[in-house]
Amino acid sequence: MQTAHTGLSHTADGADGQTSRCCPGNAGTKAVIPSGAHPVARALEASRNSSKSMVPLTQRPGTRHHRFSLFVPFPTSLEAEIACGSLVPDVEPHRGLVGKELKVSGCMLEVRWIAEDSRLLRLSIINFLDQLSLVVNTIQLFGPPVSC
């Protein structure tokens, strides 16, 4: 597998930021997508140990939500599915405070986070990138998938 270019986005809730996304097959080519085009599908609930009320993150008034999107292109959709399947079982250590969603669209692995605490968001992203690196190296080690 070749080195993948990734598009990153970080916007505050309600911001009209844009997401930069790499186009598969065109190294260095990026498409700009409005950040609101891909909302986080699930509302996140506060941790039971939190001093805040049990209102989902997306419904708390006056709370700033940090969002981060990562788009990782793969040479084939099968490799993207393999990577997604390998990364989905990893449980988020701060489940009630950080939400993570993985999805495959064609050859692109899409990962989205939402959190109130930017430090927990950063920790989750760093852990994910470590795991992603391991998965990509493993795919490279075993070579491209064989079609039956």
UniProtKB/Swiss-Prot annotation:
<dbReference type="GO" id="GO:0005737">
    <property type="term" value="C:cytoplasm"/>
</dbReference>
<keyword id="KW-0819">tRNA processing</keyword>
<feature type="region of interest" description="Disordered">
    <location>
        <begin position="1"/>
        <end position="21"/>
    </location>
</feature>
<dbReference type="InterPro" id="IPR015419">
    <property type="entry name" value="CTAG/Pcc1"/>
</dbReference>
<keyword id="KW-0963">Cytoplasm</keyword>
<dbReference type="GO" id="GO:0005634">
    <property type="term" value="C:nucleus"/>
</dbReference>
<comment type="similarity">
    <text>Belongs to the CTAG/PCC1 family.</text>
</comment>
<dbReference type="Pfam" id="PF09341">
    <property type="entry name" value="Pcc1"/>
</dbReference>
<keyword id="KW-0539">Nucleus</keyword>
<dbReference type="GO" id="GO:0000408">
    <property type="term" value="C:EKC/KEOPS complex"/>
</dbReference>
<comment type="subunit">
    <text>Component of the EKC/KEOPS complex composed of at least GON7, TP53RK, TPRKB, OSGEP and LAGE3; the whole complex dimerizes.</text>
</comment>
<protein>
    <recommendedName>
        <fullName>EKC/KEOPS complex subunit Lage3</fullName>
    </recommendedName>
</protein>
<comment type="function">
    <text>Component of the EKC/KEOPS complex that is required for the formation of a threonylcarbamoyl group on adenosine at position 37 (t(6)A37) in tRNAs that read codons beginning with adenine. The complex is probably involved in the transfer of the threonylcarbamoyl moiety of threonylcarbamoyl-AMP (TC-AMP) to the N6 group of A37. LAGE3 functions as a dimerization module for the complex.</text>
</comment>
<dbReference type="GO" id="GO:0008033">
    <property type="term" value="P:tRNA processing"/>
</dbReference>
